[in-house]
Each structure stands twice: as structure tokens, then as C-alpha cells.
């Protein structure tokens, strides 16, 4: 069960639905099996926040470590960074993924407070700033040292929900 109660999300804590979750090994096994059969070319990894942002990020890191280091997975990986997670965990996630993203969620702090009251704007923008810095640092290191590890080499992206509140798309675009 997700620890957040975002009104727009099916996984919200107040939604009384049966829940299911893959273990890191189950997800890695399923991914590598589909990849070897040419059913998929990559993985988009996102998650509800289970227990805490750190715990959830650690599960994601375990999954990607199994794929990259144990199974030799060379396909594309896009992972969602979890706001509130320890920056060291976000850094580790970015060394395993090709692209990282963070959901802005909603176009304003007002709509965030209304529809996702447990989430805070600053907590959302902190990992976005960290990812930007890590990407710039990684590029500089790779110019000096050819074999320096890459950080999210395909970059960073974001998304937001438009239409769940009174804000316009223009306001949302300015925010991002």
C-alpha cells in the first residue's frame, strides 16, 4: 500500500483495492526473460511509495542491480526517482538507469496541497536539482576520464497531471 493518499492515483492509501507487488528478483527475472525473447527493449520502473521513499528506492536499486550486474542487461532503463529519498540512493539509481524522472505531480503548490496533501513542492524539486547536477558532473568527468561511470546518460524528464485542478496547461508549462 502506498503511504501517500493522492486523490488522482489508483494506488492511494485510501483506495480499498487488492494490492500486489513484485520482489526485485521477480521483476528482474521477468524483465530479462522478456528482453531475451525480444518482447521488450527496456524497462520503465516506477513504484508506489511502499513504507518510505528510501525503502522504495532501495527496492528499485536492487532490481536494477540484478538486471545490470547479475544478468548483464544492456537494454534501456527509465526509472522514477522518489522525492524524499536519501540523495545517495538517488545517485545510485542514476548510475544504474539510462534516464531518471521525477513527477512534478500538479501545476501549483495549491493544487498539490488539495489533491496530494502529503507531498511538498520542495521535496519534489530537490531530486530534480540533484539529478541535473549529477548529470553535469558526470559529463565533465567523462570528458576527463573516458571510463568514468555515466549518470542517467539519456537525461532527465518529468511529467505532471493537467486538468485535475483549476490551473491551465500554460501555468503548468511555466512551472516545469
Where are the model-predicted features located?
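Conserved Radical SAM active-site core
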Residues: 1-4, 11-158, 162-169
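Active-site capping/gating regions of soluble enzymes
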Residues: 169-176
Amino acid at each position: 500500500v502506498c503511504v501517500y493518499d493522492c486523490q488522482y492515483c489508483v494506488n492511494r492509501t485510501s483506495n480499498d483495492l487488492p494490492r500486489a507487488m513484485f520482489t526485485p528478483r521477480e521483476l528482474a527475472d521477468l524483465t530479462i526473460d522478456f528482453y531475451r525473447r525480444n518482447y521488450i527493449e527496456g524497462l520503465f520502473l516506477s513504484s508506489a511509495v511502499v513504507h518510505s521513499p528510501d525503502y522504495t528506492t532501495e527496492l528499485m536499486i536492487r532490481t536494477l542491480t540484478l538486471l545490470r550486474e547479475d544478468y548483464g542487461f544492456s537494454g534501456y532503463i527509465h526509472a522514477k526517482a522518489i522525492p524524499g529519498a536519501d540523495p545517495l540512493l538517488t545517485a545510485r539509481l542514476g548510475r544504474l538507469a539510462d534516464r531518471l524522472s521525477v513527477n512534478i505531480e500538479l501545476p501549483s503548490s495549491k493544487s498539490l496541497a488539495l489533491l496530494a496533501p502529503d507531498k511538498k513542492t520542495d521535496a519534489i524539486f530537490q531530486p530534480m536539482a540533484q539529478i541535473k547536477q549529477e548529470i553535469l558532473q558526470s559529463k565533465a568527468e567523462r570528458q576527463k576520464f573516458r571510463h568514468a561511470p555515466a549518470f542517467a546518460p539519456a537525461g532527465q524528464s518529468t511529467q505532471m497531471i493537467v486538468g485535475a485542478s483549476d490551473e491551465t496547461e500554460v501555468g503548468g508549462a511555466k512551472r516545469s
